Amino acid sequence: MNRSDAYGYFRNQGREYVITTPRTPARWFNYLFNDTYYTEISQTGQGDSVAFRPHNRTLTRGFRYFYLKDLETGGTWSPLYQPLKTEPEAYECIHSLGTTEIRSVSQEIASSIHVFVPRAGQQEIWTVTLTNTGVKPRSLSLFTAFSLENGGVMGSKCQFDQESQILSSYSFPYHVTYGQKAGCDDHTNVVYVYPDYPADSYDCSQRAFFGGDDIYELPAAVQKGRCSGGQAEAENPLGALQQTITLEPGEQAVRHFVVGCASSLEEIRSSKAELAAKGYAVLLQETEDYWEGITGMFRVETPDDDVNAFMNIWLKKQIVMQTRTNRMSSYCPVRNQLQDALGYALVDPAGAAEYMISVLQGQERSGFIQQWIMTDGSPPKNLCLLKHTDGPVWLIICITALLNQCGDTELLQRQVGFKGSSDSATIYQHLLLAADYMAGETGAHGLCLMGDGDWNDPINGPGRLGRGESAWNTMALVYAIQALIPFCEQLGDTENAEQLNTVARRLADAVNRICWDGGWYVAGFDDDGTPFGTAQDEEGKLFLNTQTWAIMSGIASGERLDQCLAAIDSLDTPFGPRLLEPPFSGWNPKWGRISLKLAGTTENGSVYCHASMFKAFADCIAGRGSEAWQTISRTLPTNPDNPPGQNGQVPIFVPNYYFGLADSPNFGKSSHHVSTGTVGWMLWTTLEYALGIRATANGLKIDPCIPADWPEYTVERKYRSASYRIHVLNPSGISRGTVKVTVDGEAWMAAALPYEAGREYQVTVQLEQ
């Protein structure tokens, strides 16, 4: 691939991003994780590590430093650049799916510092490789220093066990009530580091190692060439280890360091023995094999190298992280969980099914599901105390999308319980209840109620009295019903199919009758029946979502469809559409919390990448292949009109938003937030609606909507238990057309591709006028 920016480039078919300088615009981090552990590794090796279970605890907060000292000359340097900011002769940081490696050369010593998180356990493994590139023997001292954060210093104790070589830190929660003591006993947390080669000296005290509180200067221990030893009590703990290494010319030395947390020193010893028996290489291979399986579910080859890299590699990683770690939070909305699982279904349908079912168990017998929830069993707080009304619609949209991937009608008959009830019902019945609830919770204009907010949950002013109505909720329900009806028909449930059709028509008619403002659809009606999101509003006139979802749901047609598209295009920037225009400049009680958000950020007028994918989806529905692809490509941090050097972000994940005020010097800056609903929708929209390799209730269908100047593209996709290699040709230079399909060299006329478990199909598709 071509170099994407002055700071780095993709290589190995997009599987690696190479950063060529330690001096990036921001902390350009990779994130490595398993189901219970997460760490961030910047281009200089810095970042936090978090253990999720038994409860979230942060360790190694603040710094991870490595120092090398030449014992003959006294020369010292930092192979990670920080903290001494030693200028290396050569430097590169290689971020990949499961690892980060930082290579540098200083004073004729080539160093490689490599880190990964094994598939199981709460630990990370660091490997230091030193090579003497000179012609003289070298005697070096290697110092490693990890800040072992463990819940405060007032009750902390850090010590080194000479026999096991385990340096560990433990801190019992200092401010704990009498009644909380037993619970704390059950959640003890010991943070540790240990080497595979014995340490020559160690430090447990941050002050002792650095010689004071300045952690950015050359440490006192490094100056002396040796750590002082001794334990630390009621002070900042540190895991510092020193080893002497001698190297002949051309010789290489390898040292491993394991950092993690456990419930006791005995558990660490046991884990250490298991790791030694298994071997570091085996653990690394397991990690690489896992990612090979995840990335192998589908592969695209289009004329757009950047989109290829994200679709084939980085979006898959991001969606796995968000789903498997629950976005690293116990405080989250079910809409996030469900939309993450929607994307996850494209790489692990079975895992996505279990995740969605765990969310579905939160649905009440009425059909309602609370939007913001605490997943750790703690009492509700903040947004969890509010009633956002869009939860049920996401159950339908995301679970039907999952069912399309799985093709398992038996899953619809699986019994799932309800929150606060001993009752259970089939998944199909759960979805019908969700539709019935939403359709029954309507206001004076026949639209779905707003409550404390819809998808745009900081709009909590208009519906706070219980009468406000949401145009978006209504459009989304129409879309959801259309997604559910094919499963009603598949099950032979014509009665519910007809009833749902009637509801969808009624709601669509209400939107077109009440919500059209002459040039676009309004956002809704407040508790007093006054429309908002209209041309008469000074701020918040035009909302992207009600235009895109009017198209996605089929509510907008004819001239209104054209006007919706024109309104959408008026919101465009070089990196995607703004979520609304104009943004709010200050508190407005009519609108609520959204007006308190900084203009140009998040929901208040940013280029909100999640909503940008709704726009790309709508473009595909409208047959605008070039516009859809442009939006997808512009949303990536590799966008040449807003490159990493300008947006400031490492280009291995899509952010939550880009700053949206055109007259601000921060226009286009990335939020750097790795948690976003963009990921699932970009995967789904790109694969199934732009490239058109679409899973349906009746099988895999082909319906591309691409840039007209594309001559061809290829998609390899595992679908259910079969594999397809699909080559699409576009000799007429069109965005959308009829498709002429051959399967294994034979003409294929059916609407869906053939399916037989275990088969591999070669498919050729030609777009025709």
Swiss-Prot record:
What's the pH dependence, according to the entry?
Optimum pH is 6.9 (for the reverse phosphorolytic activity). Stable between pH 6.6 and 8.8 at 4 degrees Celsius for 24 hours.
Any one annotated GO CC term: cytoplasm
Q: Where are the transmembrane segments?
A: none
Gene Ontology MF: a single term: glycosyltransferase activity
Instruction: Tell me if Oxidoreductase is a UniProt keyword of this record.
Output: no
Query: Which reactions appear under catalytic activity for this entry?
Result: 3-O-beta-D-glucosyl-D-glucuronate + phosphate = aldehydo-D-glucuronate + alpha-D-glucose 1-phosphate; a 3-O-beta-D-glucosyl-beta-D-glucuronoside + phosphate = a beta-D-glucuronoside + alpha-D-glucose 1-phosphate
Q: Name one GO biological process term.
A: carbohydrate metabolic process
> Gene3D superfamilies in the record, alphabetically?
1.50.10.10, Glycoside hydrolase, family 65, N-terminal domain (2.70.98.40), Maltose phosphorylase, domain 3 (2.60.420.10)
Write down the top EC class of this protein. transferase
Q: SUPFAM superfamilies of this UniProt entry?
A: Galactose mutarotase-like (SSF74650), Six-hairpin glycosidases (SSF48208)
List the thermal properties of the activity.
Optimum temperature is 35 degrees Celsius (for the reverse phosphorolytic activity). Retains more than 90% of its original activity after incubation at 30 degrees Celsius for 1 hour.
Q: Which residues belong to the signal peptide in this entry?
A: none
Keywords for this protein: Carbohydrate metabolism, Cytoplasm, Glycosyltransferase, Transferase
Cell location? Cytoplasm
Stored InterPro entries: 6-hairpin_glycosidase_sf, 6hp_glycosidase-like_sf, Carb-bd_put_dom, Gal_mutarotase_sf_dom, GH36_catalytic, GH94_Enzymes, Glyco_hydro_65_N_sf, Glyco_hydrolase_94
Q: What is its main location?
A: cytoplasm
Q: Which domain of life is it from?
A: Bacteria
Active site positions, chain numbering: 457 (proton donor)
What does the record note on quaternary structure?
Homodimer.
Question: Which family would the database say this protein is a member of?
Answer: Belongs to the glycosyl hydrolase 94 family.
This chain's function reads: Glycoside phosphorylase that catalyzes the reversible phosphorolysis of 3-O-beta-D-glucosyl-D-glucuronate into D-glucuronic acid and alpha-D-glucose 1-phosphate. Cannot phosphorolyze cellobionic acid and laminaribiose. In the reverse direction, using alpha-D-glucose 1-phosphate as a donor substrate, the enzyme acts on D-glucuronate and its artificial derivative p-nitrophenyl-beta-D-glucuronide. The apparent catalytic efficiency towards p-nitrophenyl-beta-D-glucuronide is approximately 5-fold higher than that towards D-glucuronic acid.
What name does the UniProt record give this protein?
3-O-beta-D-glucopyranosyl-beta-D-glucuronide phosphorylase
Q: Which organism is it from?
A: Paenibacillus borealis
Lineage at the top is: Bacteria, Bacillati, Bacillota, Bacilli, Bacillales
